[in-house]
A protein has these predicted regions:
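Hydrophobic transmembrane alpha-helices and their immediate junctions
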Residues: 168, 202, 206, 210, ...
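A juxtamembrane structural motif centered on a specific transmembrane helix
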Residues: 215-223, 229-233, 349-353, 383-400
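Long extracytoplasmic/lumenal interhelical loops at the membrane interface
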Residues: 116, 126, 258-328
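Transmembrane alpha-helices of multi-pass inner-membrane enzymes
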Residues: 154-158, 197-204, 357-400
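Alpha-helical transmembrane segments of multi-pass inner-membrane proteins
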Residues: 89-117, 138-189, 193-210
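A conserved mid-to-late transmembrane alpha helix and its immediate loop/hinge
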Residues: 136-141, 308-344
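Flexible juxtamembrane loops connecting transmembrane helices in multi-pass membrane enzymes
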Residues: 216-225, 237-276
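N-terminal hydrophobic segments of proteins, predominantly signal-anchor/transmembrane helices
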Residues: 4-69, 98, 363-365
Length: 400
């Protein structure tokens, strides 16, 4: 929100001095779809007489993210004199690595934790509960952080694959170190990170020919470094598991399925078991069409609510697709899907060289919605700003 506020005067200056700014045809079309989602949300809460405006104001949220992305990319361009997809990606990697390290510091050092908790309000009371006790950074916790870590893992997967065919292959080890750090600590923060990990490794296997047993020699350095860094990661994890206080608990949470497989001979994850019970479908045609007007915990927003609420979720479900349906029906769900699809499609059209990366990001978003309702529009928003910057550079060169 603060970044969006900073972006407003920058936007005003750009419009006044250069007659350029944030609004173009693509942003306008995105706004239309976000507006449709908001209108459907408004209709649902009005028809159902509920006070839950979670997605009735989605167009405002979309513009907040766009303005924040505009601010970030503008400052990057000011510092470096240019803005590119790979430059932005490197910044995103640095931010996520710092968040992971900060999460460990907050968990390990009470003084740091006290300072962060004093000045940053991000639901620490819930995160610090004995039965929750989750790692968190600054604005990075639970599935919101997990979905963004997952997005970054597939972006790293694409960039490393691209490096294998260029002189930049010397940076592969550095990117892989960041990859494993985010994969491990990210899973300690939120196991949604696993989605990105699986898609990233699957992408590497597909691109390098591992699945067909015909490995492309261009990718030999990738797999060589991958195995070495994986081995080092396992050694460090085992050491920390046995000798660093509280690490055992964090690792067992992050990779519960693997521990269950080794100790019990079966893959079992408690959150997956809970997730199965959350696949609850609407029982009336009205709910399928326009929803019931509840997205947030109804006990917290509606003093007159007498319906079904389990575990803090309306109808007891945290599944993204189902929460959208229960909130504003299939129409609202379709509008939300189109917002993300259009954002990804515009990125593909503008930055066609990175087509695979944006397809992976779309896949991350739509797979995450089978688990939670968090979206990664912010990620697409920043790359839309990259495309806009490149378009401005071309126009400037044409004038010259």
């Amino acid at each position: 929100m603060a970044l969006a506020g900073v972006g407003l005067p920058i936007l005003g200056y750009q419009l006044a001095s250069h007659r350029t700014g944030l609004i173009n045809k693509q942003v306008f079309l995105l706004s239309i779809w976000a507006g449709i989602a908001s209108i459907i949300g408004c209709f649902s809460i009005t028809f159902n007489n509920t006070p839950d405006t979670a997605y009735a104001t989605y167009i405002v949220s979309m513009w907040v993210w766009l303005s924040a992305a505009y601010t970030v990319t503008t400052y990057i361009r000011m510092v470096h004199g240019n803005l590119s997809t790979m430059l932005l990606l490197r910044y995103l990697i640095i931010v996520c690595v710092c968040q992971c390290i900060l999460a460990l510091l907050i968990d390990s050092y009470p003084n740091i934790k006290q300072i962060i908790d004093q000045y940053v309000q991000q639901g620490q009371d819930f995160l610090n509960k004995t039965n929750v006790n989750r790692l968190y950074g600054i604005g990075a916790s639970l599935d919101v952080a997990g979905s963004r870590f997952a997005a970054l893992l597939v972006m790293i997967a694409f960039s490393v694959t691209d490096m294998c065919k260029t002189d930049e292959r010397k940076y592969i080890p550095l990117f892989l170190v960041a990859f494993f750090l985010i994969a491990v600590i990210g899973n300690m923060i939120a196991r949604t990170t696993t989605i990105g990990l699986i898609l990233a490794v699957g992408y590497w296997m597909y691109m390098s020919g591992v699945l067909t047993f015909k490995i492309d020699t261009n990718y030999s350095s990738l797999w060589s470094w991958f195995l070495w860094i994986l081995a080092a990661t396992i050694v460090i994890a085992v050491f920390c598991y046995h000798f660093v206080p509280r690490t055992e608990e964090k690792l067992r949470f992050a990779f519960e399925g693997f521990f269950s497989l080794v100790e019990k001979g079966e893959w079992s994850v408690s959150s997956n078991d809970r997730l199965k019970g959350m696949y609850v479908f609407p029982e009336t045609l009205k709910t399928w069409l326009i929803g019931d007007g509840y997205f947030s915990n109804p006990r917290n927003i509606d003093p007159y609510f007498i319906g079904k609420e389990i575990g803090g979720y309306y109808m007891g479900t945290d599944v993204g697709y189902l929460r959208f349906i229960f909130y504003f029906g299939l129409g609202g769900l379709f509008a939300m899907c189109m917002v993300i699809y259009k954002a990804g499609n515009f990125c593909i059209n503008n930055l066609s060289r990175y087509r695979d990366m944006f397809l992976l990001l779309l896949l991350v978003n739509y797979v995450v919605w089978f688990k939670v309702s968090t979206d990664i529009f912010l990620v697409f928003a920043m790359f839309l700003m990259v495309a806009r910057s490149e378009e401005e550079d071309k126009q400037l060169q044409h004038k010259i």
